[in-house]
From Swiss-Prot:
PPR repeats: 214-249, 250-284, 285-320, 323-353, 361-395, 397-431, 432-466, 467-497, 503-537, 538-568, 581-615
Family, similarity comment: Belongs to the PPR family. P subfamily.
Region (Disordered): 1-23, 39-61
Keywords (A to Z) from UniProt: Repeat
Composition bias, Polar residues: 50-61
Database matches in InterPro entries: Pentatricopeptide_rpt, TPR-like_helical_dom_sf
One Pfam family of this chain: TPR_At1g68980
Listed Gene3D superfamilies: Tetratricopeptide repeat domain
Name of the protein this chain belongs to: Pentatricopeptide repeat-containing protein At1g69290
Superkingdom of the organism of origin: Eukaryota
Length: 658
């Protein structure tokens, strides 16, 4: 048994005496339910000379109570109940439980809930004192659940003490955990400790197994003694109670004791705990070590904190996988003691002991630096990093860098992040792809394009296989920010990298962006580069160029483009790649008519007729009238006979001669 293994703890008997309970109606004190002054309700205590009710009168009040509850008339129901209690009478069991359950409802405003809970408490306390057999266990549970929602710790504890005083023994599992939750939410488990002790005494003295607190309750009591009250005597009492009741401890039980022993500097006791854990078959020491760290931090014994961390690493397994809360507590202690050098030393020593299989985010270095970042001590994280480099000659694990990089990413400090990535690469370490992608995305969001390019180059140099995500992020960001010149330069840099999938759509995006911004020569050069690298232009490529040329009134360039595409769509194989459609026919016709290239325009018309593409002639009539309204055939005949023929053919086709 657990009791027998702790030789230092002498047998203690449960005390049958308990602190004096508050008055049954102390709930009427405003402090129990609210910090605001409240008008006191009259007590439910019957008058000294109660008036006896006749059977008819009692029946009438019960009927009123029943009807009021059904109609949800709370005040009327309460008045009927008060009338009965004023005559030292109680309604039947069903009505009592219905009333208390109704009053325990949490609907409505905060003030009305508080008022109803006072009445529910008063009713329950009165019934417990007068005739507890009328009160159902489930009604008590419902009332306590409402008190939990209302965070009414005082009334909840008063109700339990009232139950004990009047020997109304409700099974512990119906109310124990609720009271624990209420006390915990109220900020302290110390009040629960008294309830725990009394429940243990009743279970033993009255031989009531159902009143026995379970392991969860025992651990809550231990937490109160060790973590909050820091009382060795009370903790030993709880352990003795667990032994008497046959409650087997778990890792959490040992953890609370480890905290207290570390807090008090009782190293021998901690050694005893470790031996006891072996005896109980607990292989994991993670909870034990975490609590020891907390205790040593609280006592200011930072050397012992370092020893525990390094010892946990020597043990291997999950023993060193401490929680974020533990690392935060640890970091606070060291920083408050101005022991940044000690933190750096701990990380360096830990790196020597950590297995190569330990994940980046499971390392001690990651835990400490991540805690610094989470606590807002980013400057301290830098200081630790610099101190590690100074102490270890650059032997800094990747886990130390990751939290700082994530913080930079979150704060969009992308230039600093990029500089740090360069340092990481030069030290021979390699970042995870997800972190690199996140940094590139942050750089693009921050419009720090230089950092994004630098990070991408670093990924390429480190032979990262998956570059697709970052490539798309950069291209999309540049497009959204209308930086086609950077898109072109970036594409030119990566186009021959087999890990990057470049396609015609990427070239089209650059061409479109150049045309949209009026940089037609850059668009033309990009188009030539695209063709040179054997990327096949498609209809979207040509549409972007045509629209750009029309906007800049560069109609001759459209003619050159038509002559180029005309040859392609003549062959069957090329036609499959660059097939004329309605949009492309419309764009070419409009531009060629506006430019006065009627011969080419009629070639487009012929192609559209061959491919059975519908053409709306009205649009080109308008284009002709806007641009060539004053064009005279006699003058044109003298200068260029062929052009005149093309003009006549176009006018006949468009219906301009009628």
């Amino acid at each position: 048994m657990f009791r027998k293994t702790l030789n230092s703890i002498s047998r203690r008997h449960f005390s049958s005496s308990s602190p004096e309970s508050p008055s049954l109606y102390s709930f009427l004190k405003p402090s129990l339910f609210s910090h605001k002054p409240i008008t006191l309700s009259p007590s439910l205590s019957p008058p000294q000379n109660p008036k006896t009710l006749t059977p008819d009168q009692k029946s009438s009040f019960e009927s009123t109570l029943h009807d009021s509850l059904n109609a949800h008339y709370t005040d009327e129901a309460w008045k009927a109940f008060r009338s009965l209690t004023a005559a030292s009478s109680l309604p039947e069991k069903r009505l009592i439980n219905s009333l208390i359950t109704h009053l325990s409802g949490v609907e409505g405003s905060g003030e009305s809930i508080s008022h109803r809970l006072k009445r529910a408490f008063a009713s329950a306390a009165y019934v417990i004192e007068k005739d507890p057999i009328l009160l159902e266990f489930e009604t008590v549970r419902t009332l306590l659940e409402s008190m939990k929602l209302a965070k009414a710790a005082g009334p909840a504890l008063a109700l339990v003490k009232c139950m004990f005083k009047n020997r109304y023994f409700v099974p512990f599992d119906l109310w124990g955990h609720l009271v624990i939750d209420i006390c915990r939410e109220n900020g302290s488990l110390a009040p629960f400790l008294k309830v725990f002790k009394e429940s243990c005494r009743i279970s033993v003295d009255e031989k009531l197994e159902f009143m026995k607190p379970d392991l969860v309750a025992s651990n809550a009591a231990l937490e109160a003694c060790c973590r909050q009250m820091e009382s060795l005597a009370d903790a030993e009492n709880v352990i003795e109670s667990m032994a008497v009741l046959g409650v087997k401890p778990d890792e959490l039980s040992f953890g609370f004791l480890a905290y207290l022993y570390a807090r008090k500097g009782l190293r021998e006791k901690i050694s005893e705990l470790e031996n006891l854990m072996d005896g109980f078959g607990f292989a994991s020491r993670r909870i034990l070590y975490s609590n020891m760290i907390s205790g040593y931090v609280k006592s200011g014994d930072l050397d012992s904190v370092s020893d525990v961390i390094l010892h946990s690493l020597k043990e291997g397994g999950e023993e060193s996988s401490f929680s974020v809360e533990t690392y935060c507590e640890l970091v606070k202690g060291f920083i408050e003691s101005k022991s940044v050098k000690s933190l750096a030393k701990v990380i360096l020593e830990a790196q020597k002991l950590e297995s190569s299989y330990v994940g980046v985010d499971s390392s001690v270095g990651f835990g400490i630096i991540n805690a610094c970042v989470n606590l807002g001590f980013s400057d301290k994280a830098h200081s630790i990093l610099e101190e590690m480099i100074a102490q270890g000659g650059g032997s800094v694990g990747i886990g130390v860098y990751v939290p700082i990089l994530k913080a930079y990413c979150k704060e969009y400090r992308t230039a600093e992040a990029t500089q740090l990535v360069t340092e990481i690469s030069s030290s021979g370490l390699q970042l995870d792809v997800e972190i690199s992608n996140a940094l590139i995305e942050a750089s693009m969001t921050n419009q720090d394009f230089i950092s994004a390019f630098t990070l991408f180059r670093d990924m390429r140099e480190n032979r990262v296989v998956d570059l697709k995500g970052s490539y798309l992020t950069i291209m999309t960001g540049l497009l959204e920010n209308q930086r086609p010149e950077l898109m072109a330069a970036f594409l030119d840099e990566v186009v021959e990298d087999p890990r990057v999938e470049v396609n015609s759509h990427d070239w089209n995006s650059i061409i479109h962006a150049f045309c949209k911004s009026g940089r037609l020569e850059d668009a033309r050069r990009t188009f030539r580069r695209m063709v040179f690298l054997r990327y096949e232009p498609n209809n979207q490529t040509y549409l972007s160029l045509i629209n750009g040329y029309v906007s800049g009134e560069k109609y001759f360039n459209v003619l050159l483009l038509w002559n180029e595409i005309k040859g392609k769509i003549s062959s069957v194989e090329a036609e499959k790649r660059s097939r004329l459609d309605h949009a492309l026919v419309d764009a070419f016709l409009y531009a060629l008519v506006k430019g006065g290239f009627f011969d080419a325009a009629m070639q487009v018309v012929e192609k559209s007729q061959e491919m059975k593409i519908f053409v709306d002639k009205w649009r080109y009539k308008q284009a002709f009238m806007e641009t060539h309204k004053k064009l005279r055939l006699p003058k044109l005949r003298k200068r260029n006979y062929k052009k005149m023929e093309s003009l006549v053919a176009f006018k006949n086709w468009a219906g301009l001669n009628t």
